[in-house]
Amino acid sequence: MEVILEHLLHRAHELYQEDASSFELHSQLLLPFLDGSFTLEEYLKLDDGVLGTYFTQWSESADPILNDLAKRFLNRKPLKSATFSGNRDSKLVQELTLLVEKVGYNPVYYTAVNSSYDLPYDFYRPEQGRHRTQIEILRNDGTLIELSQVSQLVAALAGQEQGDERFFFPKEMVDPSLRDHYDLFDETYQEFASHIRNGALIEIN
C-alpha cells in the first residue's frame, strides 16, 4: 500500500499546485504537506482517522486519478508487483511501462520501481564506509561478546543483503476479471502478462 499512498499524495500535491482552493475546503490539516512547509507539530496532528476522512473525500473527486487512487487505498487494493534484476531487466521495465500507458494508465501514478535491499544485521567493520553498530552480549564474567559469535543464525545472516527490486503495476494488467475494456486492449494485456512468471519479470525470446 505504500506505493499507492505515495502516488496518491503525489497526485494531490500536483492538483494543489494547480488549484489550492479545492483542498482548502476539506483537507486543511494536509495543506502544510501539500505545499511542503509542515512543522513537527502539524505532522503530529495527522493520524489514520484524519487521513481516512480526507481520502474518502478525495474518492469523490472529479479528478479521475485522485479519485481512483483514493479508492484503491481505502479498499486495500495495492498495485501488483514482480521482482526483476536492475542490470538485466531495465529495458524490459521500460517496455512494460509503455504497455501500461498504452491501455490508459498514467505511468507516473500507476507504475513504480522500488528497491528494498537492506542488511538485517552486520557487525562492526571499521574498514568499510557503511557499517552498523554491532550488538554485544554481556557475559557472566562482565566481558562483552559480539552477537554473531554466540548465535549461528545471526552469524549466517551477518553482512548479507536481504531484499529485492520490484516493478509495480495495476493488477488489471494480469487479471482479466478486473478489466473494463478487455477486448479493446486484449493483445496488449496478453503481451504484458507473458513477461510475468512466478512473480518475476522474464524476457520472451
Q: Predicted regions: what is each one?
A:
Residues 1-205:
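Histidine-centered, transition-metal-coordinating active-site segments
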